[in-house]
């Protein structure tokens, strides 16, 4: 029997609910759910609990378990992680840490569960996989994360101090 998972509320609380082919409804994760995205066999999302605030979580519908990926910004505020993007065996996403108001590019290795800051302070948005690398927008320029060298560099569309202000990336 298969199941359909999604964020919903029955009036008493929201979370990830599953319903099987017989119509059996179960609350699998109780809490806020934002940015639900399928990554491999799991659903990744920005979830919350009273202790950690909004942090990256994952849910596996096969064994019906949910877990917090990491407490990136300790305390009840949270890292506001999002834009989860799979590249090879790594999930990349944007999240803030103790640097006030600054978002960084993070990488999470699915096989080792190692989490690292892949690009410091770049304010990444619109993470897009292109030819085995990660392209993303920053407030000033496009940036590329090279998975071979584990380094990032600007793609300088508009040379000079003004930048190009990229947005609405689309893979063709």
Predicted segments with their positions:
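Feature 14080 marks short, conserved micro-sites in well-ordered regions
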Residues: 1-172
């Amino acid at each position: 029997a298969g199941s359909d998972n999604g964020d919903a509320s029955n009036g008493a609380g929201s979370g990830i609910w599953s319903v099987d082919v017989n119509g059996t409804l179960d609350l699998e994760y109780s809490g806020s759910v934002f940015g639900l995205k399928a990554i491999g066999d799991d659903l990744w999302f920005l979830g919350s609990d009273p202790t950690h605030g909004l942090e990256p979580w994952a849910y596996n519908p096969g064994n019906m378990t949910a877990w917090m990926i990491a407490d990136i910004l300790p305390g009840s505020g949270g890292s506001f992680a999002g834009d989860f993007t799979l590249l090879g065996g790594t999930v990349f996403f944007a999240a803030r840490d103790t640097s006030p108001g600054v978002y960084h590019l993070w990488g999470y290795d699915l096989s080792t569960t190692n989490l690292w800051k892949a690009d410091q302070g770049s304010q990444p948005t619109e993470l897009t996989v292109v030819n085995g690398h990660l392209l993303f927008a920053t407030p000033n320029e496009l940036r590329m994360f090279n998975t071979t060298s584990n380094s990032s560099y600007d793609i300088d569309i508009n040379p000079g101090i003004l930048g190009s202000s990229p947005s609405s990336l689309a893979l063709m």
